[in-house]
Every structure is written in structure tokens, then in C-alpha cells.
């Protein structure tokens, strides 16, 4: 970092690290936000930071970057407000040119997808492939390991109900330090949390199961079905982050409790007709 001309980053750089005057830091962020960020958060249950401490971190980051890559007008508006860029006179730092990483979603071939499935060990399946990619929770943290996550899916129930029709690729958020043991569900649940390229998982899957993650914006480019399993919706909306979008506007069915029967119904609907 000390000798490079450009810094390309998709998260906030540590508060104590600053670019030199002749270095250019390009903030690419890591997705279009559904959940509120930075200065836009008004309710905040976080294990490590107060709301003022978080806003300070965004303020420090705003002082560092010269450019901020945005995929859309919607995202630009949210980035400007979340980093309070107008107050710092930096709203013109936004470059609204889309995410280069999404080009792969449009340029892939059947051979590319077959190669990905082979790498994942699912090349011979004729079942629907469901990518389950939940986000992390600000208020779930263990000081000994970091952020934790407890899956609120009854995989026993799902396997009995749709195991003959579907397999699940489970991708935990990179901040989550929890270890997951899916040995009991071998052949039904595949832990792909350590697989580096999430775009490959988008391409290999037939549908997305997520909650508040920004992955759905990128996945929408593929026009594949999506299910939003927001089992802790009330707490997330009222205590943790809240949202930029009314969930009724999301491009797929929304489940706002732990209703496994409803989740199974939506998975079966995908298996039967692939409705989007």
C-alpha cells in the first residue's frame, strides 16, 4: 500500500491508515444497500460501536477517498447521504458507472457454468440449486472470535420437504467467524462460505435465498427467482438498521418470521415453475 499509486477497496479502510498526497483511494464499496448505512442509521444495536462512533468512522473514510464507484442513481443517493458527502463538499466524488464485477454475469458461457459446478462438486445434479446467502447481524458478536451467526433455518424440515428436489449452497457473510457443521446434511447442504468468487455461485444456482444482503441487487441481473427470508424482520427494522426500501417492493416473496412451512412453499414454487 505504501508504494502503490491507487488504492482500490470495497470496504472502509482502518481508521488509522491514510493515503499519501500522491495516492488515489477509490472506494468501490461492496454492493447496493438495502439496509441503512453510516449517517442514515437512526436505530442501531451494535455490539462494538455506538451510532456516533460509527458515523465517525464513515466521516474518516469520506476524508480519505477521492472517488466513490456507484452502480446506479439509487445507490449514488444513498452513498452520498450515508457518508454525509454534501456536508464535506465531496458529492462529486461519486462515479456512477456500474460494478465491473457484474460484467461476468452477462458474459459467462454454458462451459463456464459447467466448470463452476464441477469445482463445487454438483455437476451431476438435476436438482434445483438454491444459494442461501444471509448477511451478518450487528448485534451478534463473541469477543473471543468475532461476529457470529446462527442459522434460523430448520434444515431437517427442509430436507424432508424438498431434499429430493433441491440442494442448498450456504454462503455465510465474510464477517461471520462462526463455524458451520453441515455433515449431517451431506448431499443436501454444501458450505461454500470459503469459495472466493460469489459471482460463480450466482451463476451456478437456480435461485437465491437471502435476507437483508445487498447480494440480491447483483443477483437480479440474472433474472432468476429470489426469496427473502427475514426471520428477524421486526428487530432488524426497529432496533438494528432499518432499510432504504419498503420490503414490499422487493423482487420476490418476503417471509418475516420463522415460518418454515411458508419457506418450503416458496421453494416448491421455484421448483415447479421458477416464478420470478
Residue ranges of predicted features:
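A donor-sugar binding/catalytic signature common to diverse glycosyltransferases
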Residues: 7-36, 195-240
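Conserved catalytic-core segment of nucleotide-activated headgroup transferases in glycan assembly
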Residues: 99-182, 257, 271
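A short beta-strand/loop micro-motif in the catalytic core of glycosyltransferases
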Residues: 6-8, 66-72, 168-169, 208-209
Amino acid at each position: 500500500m505504501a508504494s502503490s499509486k491507487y488504492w482500490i477497496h470495497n470496504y472502509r479502510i482502518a481508521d488509522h491508515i491514510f493515503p499519501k498526497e500522491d495516492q488515489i483511494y477509490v472506494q468501490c464499496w461492496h454492493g447496493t444497500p438495502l439496509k441503512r448505512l453510516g449517517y442514515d442509521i437512526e436505530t442501531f444495536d451494535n455490539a462494538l460501536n455506538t451510532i456516533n462512533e460509527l458515523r465517525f468512522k464513515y466521516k474518516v473514510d469520506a476524508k480519505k477517498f477521492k472517488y466513490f464507484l456507484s452502480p446506479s442513481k439509487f445507490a449514488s443517493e444513498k452513498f452520498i447521504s450515508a457518508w454525509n458527502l454534501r456536508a464535506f463538499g465531496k458529492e462529486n466524488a461519486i462515479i456512477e458507472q456500474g460494478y465491473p464485477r457484474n460484467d461476468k454475469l452477462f458474459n459467462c458461457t454454458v462451459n463456464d457454468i459447467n466448470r463452476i459446478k464441477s469445482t463445487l462438486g454438483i455437476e451431476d445434479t438435476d436438482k434445483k440449486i438454491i444459494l442461501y446467502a444471509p448477511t451478518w447481524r450487528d448485534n451478534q458478536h463473541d469477543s473471543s472470535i468475532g461476529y457470529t451467526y446462527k442459522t434460523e433455518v430448520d434444515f431437517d424440515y427442509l430436507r424432508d420437504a424438498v431434499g429430493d428436489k433441491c440442494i442448498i449452497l450456504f454462503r455465510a457473510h465474510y464477517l461471520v467467524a462462526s463455524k458451520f457443521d453441515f455433515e449431517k446434511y451431506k448431499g443436501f447442504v454444501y458450505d461454500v462460505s470459503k469459495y472466493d468468487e460469489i459471482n460463480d455461485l450466482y451463476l451456478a444456482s437456480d435461485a437465491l435465498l437471502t435476507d437483508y444482503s445487498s447480494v440480491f441487487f447483483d443477483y437480479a441481473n440474472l433474472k432468476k427467482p429470489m426469496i427473502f427470508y427475514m426471520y428477524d424482520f421486526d428487530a432488524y427494522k426497529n432496533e438494528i438498521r432499518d432499510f432504504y426500501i419498503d420490503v414490499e417492493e422487493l423482487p420476490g416473496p418476503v417471509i418475516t418470521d420463522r415460518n418454515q412451512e411458508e419457506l418450503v412453499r416458496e421453494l416448491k414454487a421455484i421448483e415447479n415453475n421458477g416464478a420470478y
